[in-house]
Each structure stands twice: as C-alpha cells, then as structure tokens.
C-alpha cells in the first residue's frame, strides 16, 4: 500500500496480446484451475515472454501430484469445478511444471499453504545452458 517501487497490477488475458514489456515478477492466484486447460500453454508462453531473466512467477492455488488430490476437499472442489465447466479443474503439477519448463521457467519452490493450496515459485532462466541443466 503506497509503495513507490511496486507497480499497480497489470491484468492480462491469455487470449489477448500481452504488453511488449519485461517484468521482475508475475503473480497469479486461483487461476489455473478456473481457466480451460487449453489456455495453460498460452499462459506460460506469455509469462515466459514478459519475465526478465531471473524473474519470478508465483502461482497460488490447488494442484494434484501424480494425478492424486492432496485432500478430499480438493477432490470435491474439482468435481464442483467440472460440473460448472468441464474444461476447468485442479491441474497436475507435473503438467504445470512441464509447460513452465518449455518457456524457460524452472520450479524453485513448492510450498504448502492454508486450505490445501500450494504456492509454486518459478524462476525465469538466465541462459540456454541453465534451462537444459534444470529440465
């Protein structure tokens, strides 16, 4: 609130043109499980494009691990999501990490958060060598 070195949020639509700019940080909360799964690839392509080398992307929300839910409540939430929109649903972390890696983003932290959510932190690689070393 009132910080002079932090920009106001920039709202992006994965189906629209993204700005020709570069940023140090991107944050998305409770989005991947709401959007249709076919939009995850353009999401990561956009993030990979706008982040500076060494920049961070933080994703907050529920995820599955090896196709398994982390809790019964997440399994129920996934059913609810799919009843409202069959193209939505809690995403597999392995798919998320793979899509991120295709866009020079490496997972550096995976933290448990309240209410069966995770905070995933991806770092934009600084060179081709760093990408191949971490993939």
Regions found by a protein language model. Name each.
Residues 11, 25-28, 110:
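Polytopic transmembrane helical bundles with strong interfacial aromatic enrichment
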């Amino acid at each position: 609130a009132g910080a002079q070195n932090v920009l106001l949020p920039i709202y992006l639509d994965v189906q629209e043109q993204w700005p020709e700019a570069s940023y140090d940080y991107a944050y998305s909360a409770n989005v991947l499980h709401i959007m249709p799964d076919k939009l995850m690839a353009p999401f990561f392509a956009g993030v990979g494009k706008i982040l500076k080398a060494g920049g961070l992307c933080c994703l907050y929300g529920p995820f599955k691990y090896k196709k398994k839910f982390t809790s019964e409540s997440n399994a129920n939430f996934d059913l609810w999501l799919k009843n409202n929109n069959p193209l939505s649903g809690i995403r597999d972390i392995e798919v998320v990490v793979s899509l991120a890696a295709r866009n020079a983003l490496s997972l550096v932290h995976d933290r448990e958060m309240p209410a069966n959510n995770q905070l995933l932190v991806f770092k934009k690689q600084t060179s081709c060598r760093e990408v191949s070393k971490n993939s």
